[in-house]
Amino acid sequence: MKKYNIAFTGVFDIENYGDHLFPLIFREKMKKKGIDCELFLFSPIGDVQQGYQQNYEVYPLYKLQELHDRYHFDAVIVGGGGILHYASGKQLLDKNSTEFVDYKVFETWVIPSLFAYNNKVKLIWNLPGGFHEFDYFYKPLTRCLCTTVDYMSVRDQYTKDILTSCNIPADKIYTCLDSAFI
């Protein structure tokens, strides 16, 4: 049986329950389907162990290509949450931290899109969300980045509307329940 190597992008380097939960749910679902897979977690900063006692290594997104060259990823899954924008913000990485770092959450979907294009790797969106319509300047860029997505699911109709306003075909975008409920 083939073992699938899957890269996951999300905010695994921040103590955030939902983002840390999805790889566990995914792994269990694959196991029930008889699919053997190895998960590689990537985040904007990375170089930490995943929280909540899971102890999986979280790699920085800039190492995505390097690890693909070594492990040959079969797919990249972009995690959910409010990531569909081009902004960064100041973020505490854990509850004991006192230092705010510049956290480029947009990298969790932009870098995988470029990577998938360059490497012809399957790209799957797992329910990311948007907060506001993109400025005119960003709409063509967003449309180009989304052409590499093989399966695009978003968390709500509002996010779907944001993407269709970028001329992404509505029939390519699926609105689904949070995957924690699958």
Specify the residue positions occupied by each region the protein language model found.
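Aromatic- and Gly/Pro-rich donor/ligand-binding loops
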Residues: M1-D135, C144, A180-I182
